[in-house]
């Protein structure tokens, strides 16, 4: 039996990293992970060694290095292919749990709804890249674009974060559509950290307690 693959999605500033850190402390003691298995936390882009190099290319804020929308899509896809091959699939086949900060639906939201690349093209690329490796459960931490920008006002933005509120609005609407279509667990990220964390934990217990 394979391990579990959990993904946390949302626009920048929604608290994905914070919640993954909370889960990394709770899950090993929760009783959900089988004895002998472990928890692996990862992210996209940059979850593998090659991915870290690709992340630098993708998020470089130097305007002279800005890739075309199609090149950007393929860079993310290359990162994901390596991520699945080197990190995600080996862990799941070892009965480990994997929690990822973003996965393939971020590409649909950002490159599809944000960049307006044809969604069917993205889905075809992703079907080749993912090779049937999809999350068992996805959480969508939902905040408004305005709150996202406010939370990040003291940070140095990367290239994607520098796109502005109109781009972020399109991405956020994309996430909402995907969340409804795929029946994600949607959680308001405007709540305090503990409340969000408790809702995530409760959902995991409800979904996977019988798999222990």
From Swiss-Prot:
PROSITE patterns: THYMIDYLATE_KINASE
GO biological process, one term: dTTP biosynthetic process
Highest taxon in the source lineage: Bacteria
Any one Pfam family match given in the protein's UniProt record, by short name: Thymidylate_kin
Presence of keyword Cell membrane: no
Catalyzed reaction equations: dTMP + ATP = dTDP + ADP
InterPro entries on file: P-loop_NTPase, Thymidylate_kin-like_dom, Thymidylate_kin_CS, Thymidylate_kinase
Gene3D superfamilies on file: P-loop containing nucleotide triphosphate hydrolases (3.40.50.300)
GO MF term set: ATP binding; dTMP kinase activity
PANTHER family registered for this protein in UniProt: THYMIDYLATE KINASE, UMP-CMP KINASE 2, MITOCHONDRIAL
Official protein name in the record: Thymidylate kinase
Source organism of this protein record: Prochlorococcus marinus (strain MIT 9312)
């Amino acid at each position: 039996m394979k391990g579990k693959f959990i993904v946390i999605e949302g626009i920048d500033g929604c608290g994905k990293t914070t919640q993954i850190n909370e889960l990394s402390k709770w899950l090993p003691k929760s009783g959900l992970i089988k004895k002998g298995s472990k928890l692996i936390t990862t992210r996209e882009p940059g979850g593998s060694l090659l991915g870290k190099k690709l992340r630098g290319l993708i998020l470089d804020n130097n305007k002279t290095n800005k890739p075309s929308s199609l090149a950007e899509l393929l860079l993310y896809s290359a990162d994901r292919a390596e991520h699945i091959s080197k990190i995600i699939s080996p862990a799941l086949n070892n009965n480990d749990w994997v929690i990822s900060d973003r996965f393939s639906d971020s590409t649909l939201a950002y490159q599809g709804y944000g960049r307006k690349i044809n969604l069917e093209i993205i889905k075809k690329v992703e079907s080749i890249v993912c090779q049937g490796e999809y999350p068992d459960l996805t959480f969508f931490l939902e905040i408004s674009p305005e709150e996202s920008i406010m939370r990040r006002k003291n940070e140095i933005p990367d290239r994607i974060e520098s796109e502005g509120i109109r781009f972020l609005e399109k991405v956020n609407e994309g996430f909402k559509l995907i969340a409804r279509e795929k029946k994600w667990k949607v959680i308001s990220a405007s709540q305090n950290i503990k409340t969000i964390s408790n809702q995530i934990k409760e959902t995991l217990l409800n979904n996977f307690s019988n798999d222990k």
